[in-house]
């Protein structure tokens, strides 16, 4: 769900919000856990 930037310290939170609560950054991509 969207890109992940290592320079953004809030990326993990943004990724989780993008996924609706559960999501993690794997390299340059934000992936949602189902």
UniProtKB/Swiss-Prot annotation:
Keywords assigned: Amidation, Chloride channel impairing toxin, Disulfide bond, Ion channel impairing toxin, Knottin, Secreted, Toxin, Voltage-gated chloride channel impairing toxin
Residues with the Arginine amide modification: 34
Keyword presence, Disulfide bond: yes
SUPFAM superfamilies to which the protein is assigned, alphabetical: Scorpion toxin-like
Tissue: Expressed by the venom gland.
Top-level taxonomic group: Eukaryota
GO molecular function: chloride channel regulator activity; toxin activity
Disulfide bonds: 1-18, 4-25, 15-30, 19-32
Main location as per UniProt: secreted
Protein localization: Secreted
Family, per entry: Belongs to the short scorpion toxin superfamily. Chloride channel inhibitor family.
Function as written in the Swiss-Prot or TrEMBL entry: Chloride channel ligand. Potently and reversibly inhibits CFTR chloride channels when the channels are in the interburst closed state. May also interact with chloride channels (probably ClC-3/CLCN3) and MMP2 at the surface of glioma cells. This complex may be then internalized via caveolae, thus inhibiting the chloride channels necessary for cell shrinkage and tumor propagation.
Additional free-text comment from the UniProt record: Negative results: does not inhibit ClC-1/CLCN1, ClC-2/CLCN2 or ClC-3/CLCN3 voltage-gated chloride channels, GABA(C)/GABRR receptors, Shaker Kv1.1/KCNA1 potassium channels, or the multidrug resistance proteins ABCC1 (MRP1), ABCC2 (MRP2) and ABCC3 (MRP3).
Entry protein name: Toxin GaTx1
């Amino acid at each position: 769900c969207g890109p992940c930037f290592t320079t953004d310290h809030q990326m993990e939170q943004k990724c989780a919000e993008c996924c609706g609560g559960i999501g993690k950054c794997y390299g340059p991509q934000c992936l949602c856990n189902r």
